[in-house]
Amino acid sequence: MKAMVSNASGGYCLNSAMPQPSPMPGMMLVRVEAVALNPYDTKVIEYGIITPEPYVGGCDFAGVVVAAGPGVTRFQPGDPVLSMHTRGGFAEYALAFEDMSCHIPKGMSYNEACSLGLGIGISGLALFQQPGLNLPLQHGQDLSDMTGNGRSNGYTNGHTNGHTNGHSKGEEEQKDPVIVLVAGGASASGTMATQLLKLAGYNPIVTCSPANNSLCESFGASACFDYNSTTCGADIRLHTDNSLAYVVDCVTNVATMTMCYEAIGTQGGTYIALDATANTVKYTRRDVRADWVMANTLLGEPCKLDGVYGRSSAPEHREFASHFFRLAERWLAEGKIRNHPLEIRTGGLESVDAGLQDLRDGVIRGKKLVVPLHVGA
């Protein structure tokens, strides 16, 4: 089969003779219809995260189930599916985990669907698990069994159902929703985090360019702040009456981290990023817990990497993902989650490397890059 594999120059090249994978227990073989491009796909090469060669990139994809491995019960051949993985999507056929996949709802194209999987996984991890913000899901969204039988399996992301930040359900109903800041609200990760926060019962506010205020508000942001303003952090602190305690940073650089630290109230709080945090900022406030999440841990396996990217196995993250993707599937079917604005690239797999270079160069603003592998995806 054809696939885009990493090369020595730090990019991806087409290999037309890659073996077609076979599904292991709990996995499915998917004929890929469309793939989305993410900064992660460049970092795995630039930081030497993946060895040995060849490495097939691609963590966001959608397609049709061709074969189901042993133990798969939710999907069958012919089902349209969206999924996330840490590799393998830049190919004609890819493996998908049953418990990290969603049925594509009627009316959603493969181009739209392929842009959702990684965002659901990484945003869910950043918001509702350790080492992320570990926010309780509210309004009864307790990650109970999503098979439709109405019975809870007892999984509540470590919190008692109906309780939020130490308050009882009765107290919660008398209070305004807890505010959470999403830095980089106009990014694909930002709009997904905003939607998930809103669905979980929180009040998301965001930073973005003023030109993207309407976009962010359409995804559920209650207030937008200009990240270019020198008073952005102070403006947010004023808006939140010096009480902001939760921040997720979808940009993750020194400037945004500094701004987020300025926005967090004097009682302190939690700052979570989607990449390694800068120590130059991290320890400027001892009352702020700063950490970051990475998609690899959603698999529940150790990340055998050098430096800050090395992580031990986190089986609780895999357990969380298996339940959260069920919940996300329901929200998708109900039309409560939608995709970020897309930029469609023609040329099939061979256009992937040029698209990733555009991500590196910062050419893409306010769009998620998608590459359809077949006409009409």
From Swiss-Prot:
Residues 7-370 form the Enoyl reductase (ER) domain. Residues 143-173 are annotated as: Disordered. Residues 156-167 have a biased composition (Low complexity). The gene is FMN2. SMART domains: PKS_ER. Its EC number is 1.-.-.-. NADP(+) binds at A186, S187, A188, S189, S209, P210, A211, N212, Y227, L274, D275. Keywords: NADP, Nucleotide-binding, Oxidoreductase. Induction: Expression is induced when NaNO(3) is used as sole nitrogen source. Expression is positively regulated by the cluster-specific transcription factor FMN4. Residues 144-155 have a biased composition (Polar residues). GO terms for molecular function: nucleotide binding; oxidoreductase activity, acting on NAD(P)H. This is Trans-enoyl reductase FMN2. The lineage of its organism: Eukaryota, Fungi, Dikarya, Ascomycota, Pezizomycotina. Pfam families: ADH_N, ADH_zinc_N. Belongs to the zinc-containing alcohol dehydrogenase family.
